[in-house]
Regions:
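Classic N-terminal secretory signal peptides
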Residues: 1-24
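Long, charged/polar, soluble alpha-helical segments
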Residues: 20-117
């Protein structure tokens, strides 16, 4: 290999490392919001419940995030909304489940309004 090839390969490798670490910086609460948004977009109750469970898992994990400040009141209210979304989704009531997931998103966004990220 010549020097230009080695330099090009090294540059690509460094860019790949930095871009993958940038992707990994989403907080658990950010991921909870993403899954709740997917729940709202789902058409079937079971799918809403599935995404809501994933959202709830990340929301609970966010309680251990040390990098950001989270308003626990809104976080807990969002988790309660997800519980409703899961229950309604499991019962096949997609519309009510979507509404509850929408409420969860609102609570999670309020929980992060005064964060440092």
């Amino acid at each position: 290999m010549n020097m230009k090839t080695i330099t090009l390969f090294t540059s690509i490798l460094i860019m790949a490392i930095f871009s993958s670490s940038a992707l990994a910086t989403l907080s658990h609460l950010d991921q909870a919001i993403q899954h709740a948004e997917a729940a709202v977009k789902s058409d079937e109750g079971e799918a809403v419940a599935k995404h809501s469970r994933m959202s709830k898992s990340h929301a609970n994990a966010s309680k251990g995030d040390k990098d950001i400040q989270i308003d626990r009141k809104h976080l807990d209210q969002g988790i309660e909304s997800l519980n409703v979304a899961i229950s309604e989704g499991n019962d096949g009531n997609a519309e009510a489940a979507q509404e509850a997931a929408t409420e969860a998103i609102q609570h999670f966004r309020h929980a992060t309004l005064h964060t440092n990220h």
